[in-house]
Regions:
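Acidic active-site catalytic centers that drive phospho-/nucleotidyl reactions
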Residues: 10, 39, 100, 118-121
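Short, well-structured N-terminal submotif of metal-dependent ribonuclease cores
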Residues: 1-61, 137-140
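Structural motif
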Residues: 28, 65-68, 126
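Helix N-cap/beta->alpha junction signal
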Residues: 33-34, 73, 100, 118
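Active-site neighborhoods of divalent-metal-dependent phosphate/nucleic-acid chemistry enzymes
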Residues: 2, 42, 67-113
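Residues that scaffold the ATP/ADP-binding catalytic core of kinase and kinase-like folds
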Residues: 16-18, 43, 80-83, 125, ...
């Protein structure tokens, strides 16, 4: 697989980075979105176990230290409308996948490929270039 110089990581891929063995599958310069940072920020607030809360807070702090998130701006908002329409047209509810739809919109608005371990979540979205990353828990084919 050829590497893109820059690419947007979805939230699950960011969280799995320490477990992803093949760095060649990732962009040379990975980026995250403000939506991913927002999604991560929920984690420590809803964790009931103190150890889990601390681990999730560490993930947020690490993401903040490692990345300058791309914003959900007006261009992304316009792209979001198209993403939501595509999801609805394929029988999926954009509301149920709002974070994913917003991340996809940011990728489209910035003309970036989206790197994900959950490629099926982004299938059928026009204008979105998805780079599927093998999930570390998937059994080999």
């Amino acid at each position: 697989m050829s590497r893109h110089p820059v690419g947007l990581l979805d939230t699950s891929t960011l969280l799995l980075l320490p477990r992803l063995g093949a760095a060649a599958d990732l962009p040379e310069r990975p980026l995250i979105s403000a939506v991913t940072l927002a999604e991560l920020t929920v984690g420590p607030l809803v964790a009931e176990d103190l150890t889990e809360r601390a681990a999730r807070l560490a993930e947020v702090l690490q993401a903040e230290a490692d990345f300058a998130p791309l914003p959900f701006d007006a261009q992304a908002a316009r792209a979001f409308g198209l993403v939501a329409a595509d999801l609805r047209g394929s029988g999926r509810k954009a509301r149920a996948r709002t974070f994913d739809a917003m991340i996809a919109a940011i990728a489209i608005a910035n003309d970036l490929p989206l790197y994900t371990c959950n490629a099926a979540d982004f299938a059928g979205i026009a204008g979105l270039r998805v780079v599927a990353i093998p999930h570390p828990d998937a059994s080999p084919a």
